[in-house]
Structure formats: structure tokens, C-alpha cells
């Protein structure tokens, strides 16, 4: 993974097949791949041979087996240290259909997220309530639990997909917010030790 004091560059994928083939995207200089859900196995299979760390969360349209055999580590409600950063995640979205595996009531999402401690980089399929969501579209309302998590834990970066914000919020308080649809290259924050002056 290179120098632990330098920022990592991530290829982040969410919601739809990138318009550039994954094999070509992986030729770019990246340190890891982050998946934010609603991507089919067919969309992800090119990652199987990539010798990079791969972390992800599932989206509201996923079945929960899309990462199998591809080497993507599911970080839903988990914390994982990588390259000097702590990553965590939350799968799914606001419950708008009862038959979806990765949908939550606002109350259930809040309860689950209270168990997740501080992370530097938070991966989520859904945005937080009131940030890059759509209050007029029941399927694209953000999760109150994610908003509470941002207020409580203040991660350095929050990455999400799921919605279609016309002008995405890029910062909320101390947290950099990145909306992803298709693919996006993101420079992650420097590890905490290298963010403090010597």
C-alpha cells in the first residue's frame, strides 16, 4: 500500500456500471477500490483479479452475494484498518419496500449505527438525512442514523451513492462528503498521525 503517511487514492464505484471499462480504470494509479452498492456481479467481476484492497457496502437493490468470489470485504457495521485509516460502513437505504434485504426503518438504522465507533472514512449506500438526499422522493430520503453518526463521530470523509443531487454537498462540518454515481477517483484524507503538525 505505499507510504503510510501519504494519502491513498481510491477508485469508488456506486449504482451503475462505469462508462469506462473497469479494467481500464484499474490501470490508473489507485491504492484501493471502494464499492457503495447497487452494482451487479457482472459489473464487479473485473475486480476479481485486481491485487488491491477492496472494501464495500451493499445497496438497497443488492441481494448480498455480489461480493462473493471477487475479494470485496463487506464493511457493513464493521471497522477495518487499512493504510493508516479506519474504514467503516453501512449498507442499504431508507425502507420504502418491505421486500428489500438492505432497507431500514429510520429507527432501526439509528439503533444499528449507535454500535459503530469512530472511523476516518465512512462508506454508505445512502446519504445522511438532509445531505444530498431528496425529501420529496420516498426512495431517496437519507437516513437519520447516518446524520446522527456524522454529528457524533465526525469522520474525515463520508462516501455515498443512491441519490441524484443536482449540486452535491461536498462538506458538512468537519467531514468531506463525496457523492458517487458510476465511478469517481477520490483522494482519501491523510492518516491522522500525518495530519497533525510535528
Regions inferred by a protein language model and the residue ranges of each:
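Beta-strand-turn-beta hairpins that frame and shape the catalytic cleft
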Residues: 1-11, 79-89, 121, 170-177, ...
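N-terminal active-site segment of His-dependent metallophosphoesterases
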Residues: 1-49, 114-118
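Conserved catalytic scaffold of divalent metal-dependent phosphoesterases
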Residues: 15-20, 55-145
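Divalent metal-coordination and catalytic microenvironments
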Residues: 15, 33, 38, 59, ...
Amino acid at each position: 500500500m505505499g507510504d503510510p503517511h501519504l494519502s491513498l487514492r481510491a477508485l469508488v464505484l456506486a449504482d451503475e456500471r462505469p462508462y469506462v471499462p473497469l479494467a481500464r480504470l484499474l490501470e490508473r494509479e489507485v491504492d484501493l477500490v471502494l464499492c457503495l452498492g447497487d452494482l451487479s456481479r457482472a459489473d464487479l467481476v473485473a475486480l476479481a483479479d485486481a491485487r488491491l484492497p477492496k472494501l464495500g457496502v451493499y445497496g438497497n437493490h443488492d441481494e448480498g452475494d455480489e461480493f462473493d468470489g471477487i475479494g470485496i470485504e463487506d464493511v457493513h457495521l464493521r471497522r477495518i484498518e487499512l493504510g493508516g485509516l479506519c474504514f467503516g460502513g453501512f449498507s442499504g437505504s431508507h425502507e420504502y419496500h418491505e421486500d428489500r434485504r438492505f432497507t431500514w426503518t429510520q429507527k432501526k438504522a439509528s439503533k444499528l449505527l449507535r454500535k459503530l465507533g469512530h472511523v476516518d472514512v465512512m462508506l454508505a449506500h445512502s446519504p445522511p438525512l438532509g445531505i444530498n438526499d431528496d425529501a420529496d422522493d420516498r426512495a431517496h430520503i437519507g437516513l437519520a442514523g447516518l446524520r446522527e453518526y456524522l454529528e457524533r463521530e465526525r469522520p474525515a470523509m463520508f462516501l455515498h451513492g443512491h441519490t441524484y443531487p443536482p449540486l452535491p454537498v461536498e462538506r458538512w462540518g468537519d467531514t468531506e462528503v463525496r457523492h458517487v454515481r458510476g465511478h469517481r477517483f477520490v483522494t482519501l484524507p491523510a492518516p491522522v498521525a500525518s495530519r497533525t503538525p510535528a
